[in-house]
Amino acid sequence: MPIPVLAAAQCAIRDGDLEGNVALHLQFMQRAAELGVELLLFPELSLTGYEPSIASALALPRATPLLAPLQALAQQAGMTTIVGLPLRVPGRAKPQIAACTLHPDGAVTTYTKQYLHAGEEQFFSAGSGGELLSISGQAIALSVCADFAEPEHAANAASAGADVYAASVLIGEPGYPHDSVILQGYAQQHGMAVLMANHGGPTGGWAAAGRSAFWDELGQCVASTEGAGNRLLVISRGLKGWSGVSISEPDPGWPAPQLPQVRSAQSVENR
């Protein structure tokens, strides 16, 4: 039976620095690939930062060339990678908050945030969710931040057969106790493990708490990161259940990624 290896990439990005944030994502991806990670989850809007007031200017189309090096590394490593960005949608005046899944076969699929925080509707359009992912026999349901504030969202994921509820979030220190209890409760209530990837630094005026975490199907916290900063939380499941480890600070200790040859964005299948 295959052993699933999942990870949360808790990254301290720079708002609006797309080139620098892509480089940081690549660094996380290479380290995760070295550790055998099969699914790597980044936080909400990880590529741009959480900047609602300029989201329209930062919004990217589905076939953006920005994803090309990330797609290439995901494909080379055979690692499903989920990154966050504001998605420009034809026919909509406002972008959607998207979690883009880069598949090992080169394809890209998108999950769009269904439930918006109060005030986000000024800058974003609500999305329609997305399909379950499958990693080593585990069905993975995606969630973006305020989605998990709606109990119906997690209940629907469990009803669809999800084994793991993967939440890309931005949670500050004041809200962390409340929000972590909600996620733990979903794990316990639905018998569905929960992986949470939080930002590791300030973004959009919010001081992120970090403390990315994983709860097993009984609601037990298997592993979490300590505070903010660049951290990689790696989780695996063996015969004795889930186990995890937190790895700190990708730079300067982590080597620069050796990039694979990048194909044209137009040559990558998008669905």
Stretches with model-predicted labels:
Residues 7, 100-102, 109, 213, ...:
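Conserved hydrophobic/aromatic positions in well-ordered beta-strands
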Residues 132-134, 199-271:
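C-terminal beta-strand edge segments of enzyme domains
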Residues 63-82, 149-232:
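CN hydrolase (nitrilase-like) catalytic-core segments centered on the catalytic cysteine
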Residues 90-160, 173-175, 179-181, 238-255:
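Active-site catalytic loop in hydrolytic enzyme cores
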Residues 10-15:
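Short polar catalytic/cofactor-binding loops
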Residues 1-8:
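Extreme N-terminal starter segment of soluble prokaryotic enzymes
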Residues 40, 139-144, 165-167:
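Short hydrophobic-aromatic micro-motifs
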Residues 18, 22-104, 173-192:
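Cys-nucleophile CN-hydrolase/nitrilase-fold catalytic domain and related Cys-dependent amidase chemistry
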